[in-house]
Amino acid sequence: MHLSELTHPNQLHGLSETQLEAVAKQIRERHLEVVSNSGGHLGPGLGVVELTLALYQTLDLDRDKVVWDVGHQAYPHKLITGRYGSFDSLRQQGGVAGYLKRTESRFDHFGAGHASTSISAALGMAIARDRQGLDYKCVAVIGDGALTGGMALEAINHAGHLPSTPLLVVLNDNDMSISPPVGALSTYLNRMRLSPPLQFLSGSVEESVRNLPFMGGEIPPELNRLKESMRRLAVPKVGAVFEELGFTYMGPIDGHDIAEMTRTFQSAHRVGGPVMVHVVTKKGKGYPYAEADQVGYHAQSAFNLSTGKARPSKTPKPPSYSKVFGQTLVKLCEQNPKVVGITAAMATGTGLDILQKALPDQYIDVGIAEQHAVTLSAGMACDGLRPVVAIYSTFLQRAFDQLIHDVGIQKLPVTFVLDRAGIVGADGPTHQGQYDISYMRAIPNFTVMAPKDEAELQRMLVTCLNHDGPTALRIPRGPGEGVPLMEEGWEALPIGCGEVVREGNDVLIVAYGAMVPKAMATAKCLAAVGVEVAVINARYLRPLDEALIHPMAKQIGKIVTMEEGALAGGFGSAVLESLQEKGLAIPMLRIGIPDRLVDHATPQQSFEALGLTPDQMAVRIKQHFLLSTSGSLTLEEKAPAEVSSAG
């Protein structure tokens, strides 16, 4: 059977092991073909090909439900559930999503882009099934990295106390999440994998039996059952922690042996309560470059399949904000040994891998545990350290209570660097950093800021570390503006002070963070047709520079706010509230992300869809204030009518 003919996972039923291995080979080839051309997650999916086929062979996917944790390991799932033909559109606007979406396929039973949610969701489905008297299987597939998340452990604790609720949890143990996982649980799993008796059983004994002349290289079912019995006798402590929590534990088993996994899953389905099947896989399996560099090939931009090297950019790009942050933090850590960088399993993405290599003693990775990262930093700040916590904007949402309760209320000097703030592109709605402006501005005692470029980022980082209180600094994904950077000697900025970056008398734009360069470009568009626009780089969300904004707003009489974040409760709302509290009724337009989710696309496509390109914003400003111009604005017809504004 060719993979293109496989439109329903139930077509796997009855295929021989040889046929399934042929399908596995085709899945890897298609996976590599598409990701090498368009980019996407590579290593996670390559590691679960056999696991997916073996699991789905034992299920009726017209009834049974599988919840994949995070979703970036589910590319093989997509390829055998009717998306082979459309897979070329992976992570492209209007195409196949990089994560699971309930609206994309009836086989995507639960959407996810954040880690550690699968067991809770699958358990919820199992409880709903039992309460309605229905009969179908509920399965969660979770990686060992995601298992370090507190939510996953909470779900295991709950499921273990429901002995009559059938639930299968498949632990995909590849000793990796995005970076190598950390903590006692990871160490425990590693001990289980490397247990000498288990290695002996899985390796030497099996190889000896296969090599017997009358075996023909095959292991008969009777000896497989004997091997499993010997495994349990020889390694009695394997899985003890899960069994103490109420699960029936099976494994560890080879995650690339379809026959062994199929037998184990069939046995697991016969158990009447929660079962944990521990499957050991190799991230990047089948592609040597991905096997050799499991961190680098977790996710890739387009690359040359034969060399494994990224395709060169058509035009050179400045260093990313994340890289500038990481390099600057190293310098500041060298100057002050009390500064410590903290990440939640995202060292490479946030730039903290630079600190990890340079000053490992001033670097901490807590694993996928954002709540713990925040309160850990609070405790460190209590006793004299200056923690800098670098977390993606979308992931810091998971620790909102800790931001308030453990840091904000106690006025502790912790710095949060919110990476990937704003539009992120192809990862879609689960990863857009569109909410942090709204949630951070609501927390008392925080000073919240965003730089207009990478040079201002450096000064803001110094400002944060000099400030005796909690601070938050948001930075966008992607390259900086290409401005000159200082190697050291950065000066702190005055707290709560913005700056005028362009003079004008017709309209005032107050822009926040990454929208400042777009505001300048918008002003240039309007200047070309005779409208002179003043631009303020706000710098601060909390506290606002009212002393600068209010007089200019009164003098000019028309004000526009620009932010790369949700309009609801965002920067524009802060400015509007500030004006109203002072009784200043000034005509106003708020520009930002309206009340909608932003789907996967390139950042530029997202900006266009949201009406956030300079020419579109120039048209909106002209139309909103009924401005007279000396000429026509270009691309006027492209200004999207659906993007809301507030006056």
UniProtKB/Swiss-Prot annotation:
Gene3D superfamilies: 3.40.50.920, 3.40.50.970. PROSITE patterns: TRANSKETOLASE_1, TRANSKETOLASE_2. One of its GO terms (cellular component) is cytosol. The keyword Transferase applies. Mg(2+) binds at residues 144, 174. It comes from the Bacteria. Its EC number is 2.2.1.7. Binds 1 Mg(2+) ion per subunit. GO terms for molecular function: 1-deoxy-D-xylulose-5-phosphate synthase activity; magnesium ion binding; thiamine pyrophosphate binding. Thiamine diphosphate binds at residues 72, 113-115, 145-146, 174, 287, 370. Keywords: Isoprene biosynthesis, Magnesium, Metal-binding, Thiamine biosynthesis, Thiamine pyrophosphate, Transferase. HAMAP family: DXP_synth. Homodimer. Belongs to the transketolase family. DXPS subfamily. Catalyzes the acyloin condensation reaction between C atoms 2 and 3 of pyruvate and glyceraldehyde 3-phosphate to yield 1-deoxy-D-xylulose-5-phosphate (DXP). PANTHER family: 1-D-DEOXYXYLULOSE 5-PHOSPHATE SYNTHASE-RELATED, 1-DEOXY-D-XYLULOSE-5-PHOSPHATE SYNTHASE, CHLOROPLASTIC. This is 1-deoxy-D-xylulose-5-phosphate synthase. The lineage of its organism: Bacteria, Bacillati, Cyanobacteriota, Cyanophyceae, Synechococcales.
